[in-house]
Design a protein with these regions (language model features):
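Mid-domain, small-residue-enriched loop/turn segments at the edges of structured enzyme/sensor domains
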Residues: 40, 114, 135-195
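N-terminal export signals
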Residues: 5-21
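Acidic helix-start/capping segments at beta-turn-to-alpha-helix junctions
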Residues: 48, 88-105, 141-142
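Extracytoplasmic
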Residues: 38-40, 58-60, 66-68, 87-89, ...
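Conserved catalytic neighborhood of penicillin-recognizing serine enzymes
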Residues: 98-135, 143, 176
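Short, conserved catalytic-motif segment at the N-terminal edge
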Residues: 35-62
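Active-site SXXK
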Residues: 51, 63-92, 125, 260
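Structured C-terminal helix/loop/strand segments within mature extracytoplasmic catalytic/sensor domains
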Residues: 23-33, 37, 54, 140-142, ...
Length: 290
């Protein structure tokens, strides 16, 4: 009951109307960066104690999730563990013939027929963005159940339509979608639970565990590239043709954690997009430290 009350309140906080006078210089800066970028970018940023976002630019526009949806898959596992203890210890059997796809550096090294617990698959799915590990979890829980957990958490415009597929197919179609605001809400709940030791989308203990896993992310080229060295960041990236995404909690153990989600689509110049992501991250972080 407490979790349900929090989830409703969290959604209300996330979409609280932002006063027109709030951080106009940051808003203008983000818009200028977006207009100069070859493609579309959406940005959502919020601290835990603000009733309004630091910035919300195209925050409710739909974007391809790419691998950022794996955060929801992880959150589903922990939410279900709270409801049905033992969920994280259930096993899934790996088949080279039916499971292995591209973008699976960890699972490609595993023996055929090996068994993994749900918890064991979460780490490579997040930290290495292993697509096969993600698909094994999606198959285990089911697309509908993952979407249900997202819906219960207030993710109104996030939809997992299918498993991850080989790169050639991803180029043709990407129908897993979300918004910067939805991804912001998801990370807000995980960080809120961890930072304030309260149950949100999952118990406080599991929120701590999710943040710790994301702290081990190996792809640090996007949002972390715009943040000063040494600042802790828990993030999850995602890439497909025309899209470079990153969703993060900046300084998750500090006094003022920042949830920042940056989604893109229609990119024609990845170097320029990377520069734009760095500029956005730098501007958002700078706005909170004076």
């Amino acid at each position: 009951m407490k979790r349900a009350v929090f989830l409703g309140a969290a959604a209300a906080v996330l979409f609280f109307p932002r006063p027109t006078f709030a951080l106009p210089s940051l808003e203008r800066h983000i818009r200028a960066i977006a207009h100069a970028m070859p493609g579309k970018i959406g940005v959502y940023a919020q601290t835990l104690d603000d009733r309004s976002p630091l910035v919300a630019y195209r925050a409710r526009d739909l974007f391809p999730t790419a691998s950022t949806i794996k955060v929801l898959v992880m959150a589903t596992a922990y939410a279900l563990e709270d409801r049905t203890p033992g969920t994280l210890d259930t096993t899934v059997t790996f088949s080279h013939a039916s499971d292995l796809i591209g973008g699976s550096d960890f699972m490609s090294e595993q023996p055929d027929g090996a068994t993994f617990t749900v918890r064991q698959l979460i780490v490579p799915m997040i930290q290495l963005s292993d697509n096969t590990a993600a698909n094994m979890l999606i198959g285990h829980f089911g697309v509908e159940q993952i979407n249900d957990v997202g819906g219960e958490a207030g993710l109104q415009n996030t939809h997992l339509a299918r498993k991850f597929i080989d790169t050639a197919a991803i180029v043709r179609v990407e129908n897993n979608v979300t918004t910067p605001a939805d991804m912001g809400l998801l990370l807000y709940q995980i960080e809120k639970g961890a930072h304030e030791d309260i149950p949100t989308i999952a118990s406080a203990t599991f929120c701590h565990e999710m943040i710790a896993i994301m702290m081990g992310q190996t792809d640090r080229e996007k949002i972390p590239g715009g943040i000063p060295p040494g600042v802790p960041i828990a993030n999850k990236t995602g890439e497909i043709t025309g899209t470079r995404n990153d969703v993060a909690v900046i300084n998750p153990y500090g006094n003022t954690p920042i949830v920042l989600t940056i989604l893109t689509k229609g990119l024609t110049n990845y170097e320029a997009a990377s520069s734009a992501i760095h500029q956005v991250a730098r501007a958002v972080y700078g706005s909170t430290i004076g």
